[in-house]
């Protein structure tokens, strides 16, 4: 039983180490001097209200988010109310 736990932890560490980080660096915006709290021109701010971030709405009116805020590369889904490109999002710190 301990071997299975050790092997699963080793596999998780190997997958984490193999994850490319060059795409994440490109998505962080300068934010126009806002300390990284705003999105670039090519990105859209998205508010996620749920704990699991499954329900994310585009911030149309520019209001504050009560949940988590993310900058997303929307591409083809610009103008939609529901963000379908959840993998292209980076959380705003």
Curated annotation (Swiss-Prot):
Disulfide bond sites: 39-71, 47-65, 48-56, 72-89
Signal peptide range: 1-26
Gene ablation phenotype (knockout): Does not affect mycelium morphology, wettability nor growth under stressful conditions such as toxic heavy metals (Cd and Zn), oxidative stress (by H(2)O(2) and menadione) and plant-derived organic compounds displaying toxic/antimicrobical effects (caffeine, tannic acid, gallic acid, quercetin and caffeic acid). Leads to a reduced capability to colonize Vaccinium myrtillus roots.
Subcellular localization, as worded in the UniProt entry: Secreted; Secreted, Cell wall
Signals that turn on the gene: Expression is up-regulated during mycorrhizal symbiosis with Vaccinium myrtillus.
Keyword set, alphabetical order: Cell wall, Disulfide bond, Secreted, Signal
Subunit structure: Self-assembles to form functional amyloid fibrils called rodlets. Self-assembly into fibrillar rodlets occurs spontaneously at hydrophobic:hydrophilic interfaces and the rodlets further associate laterally to form amphipathic monolayers.
Entry's family note: Belongs to the fungal hydrophobin family.
Purpose of the protein: Aerial growth, conidiation, and dispersal of filamentous fungi in the environment rely upon a capability of their secreting small amphipathic proteins called hydrophobins (HPBs) with low sequence identity. Class I can self-assemble into an outermost layer of rodlet bundles on aerial cell surfaces, conferring cellular hydrophobicity that supports fungal growth, development and dispersal; whereas Class II form highly ordered films at water-air interfaces through intermolecular interactions but contribute nothing to the rodlet structure.
Protein name: Class I hydrophobin SSP1
Native source species: Oidiodendron maius (strain Zn)
Gene this protein is translated from: SSP1
């Amino acid at each position: 039983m301990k071997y299975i736990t050790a092997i699963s932890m080793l596999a998780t560490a190997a997958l984490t180490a193999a994850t490319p980080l060059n795409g994440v660096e490109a998505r962080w915006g300068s934010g126009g001097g806002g300390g990284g709290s705003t999105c670039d021109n090519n990105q859209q701010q998205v508010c996620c209200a749920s704990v699991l971030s499954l329900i994310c709405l585009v911030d149309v009116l520019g209001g504050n988010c009560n949940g988590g805020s993310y900058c997303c590369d929307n591409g083809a889904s610009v103008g939609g109310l529901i963000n379908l490109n959840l993998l292209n999002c980076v959380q705003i710190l």
